Regions:
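Non-catalytic DNA-recognition/assembly elements of restriction-modification systems
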Residues: 85-167
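Polybasic, glycine- and aromatic-enriched phosphate-binding surface used to engage nucleic acids
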Residues: 1-96
Length: 167
């Protein structure tokens, strides 16, 4: 598995590829690839969750180039600078935090896939959207805890899409 990162995007754009997709990359457009070396115990879903969190997006905006309309270039140069919380795989509490984030991230993806299938049916989409949004908040709270932040502290981080949104 690998993560395909949309280099120039307005919000988190970190897709997991488990189909072996061929990707072209380079510069401030296109895509870049993130892989976890086989000898590492990290899940690519853990990395995806951290990068897509409020903290990850904020750091991408600080390190990346910001373009008109709220587009942020988040290529390999930027991604290398974003600190991913290390997990001590000898510590059961750390392992549990990692696995909890991974489980929730996979569930978010599954619900997102279901939402895409029913997007033209508001009656079916509405409950899925509520579940998805509640799960996103739960995931963000878990990531806050991982970094030792309260929800109040996390809310002090400006949302990039609001700061750089095109009107």
């Amino acid at each position: 598995e690998k993560m395909i990162v949309g280099v120039l995007s307005q919000s988190e754009k970190y897709a997991i590829d488990n189909k072996g997709t061929l990707v072209s990359s380079g510069g401030t457009a296109g895509y870049c690839i993130v892989c976890v070396p086989p000898e590492k115990k990290y899940s690519i879903y853990y990395i995806q969750a951290i990068l897509g969190s409020v903290q990850g997006e904020w750091l991408a905006s600080l390190y990346g180039e910001i373009f008109r309309g709220g587009y942020i270039a988040r290529g390999t140069k930027v991604l290398k600078q974003i600190p991913i919380r290390c997990i001590d795989f000898e510590n059961q509490d750390d392992i549990a935090k990692h696995d909890d984030i991974v489980r929730r991230q996979k569930k978010l993806i599954a619900i997102g896939d279901k939402l895409a299938q029913v997007r033209n049916n508001p009656r079916k989409a509405a409950p899925l959207k509520r579940i998805f949004e509640a799960l996103k908040i739960e995931q963000q709270n878990a990531i806050n805890g991982l970094y030792g932040m309260s929800s109040d502290e996390q809310r002090q981080i400006p949302l990039i899409k609001e700061i750089y949104a095109a009107n």
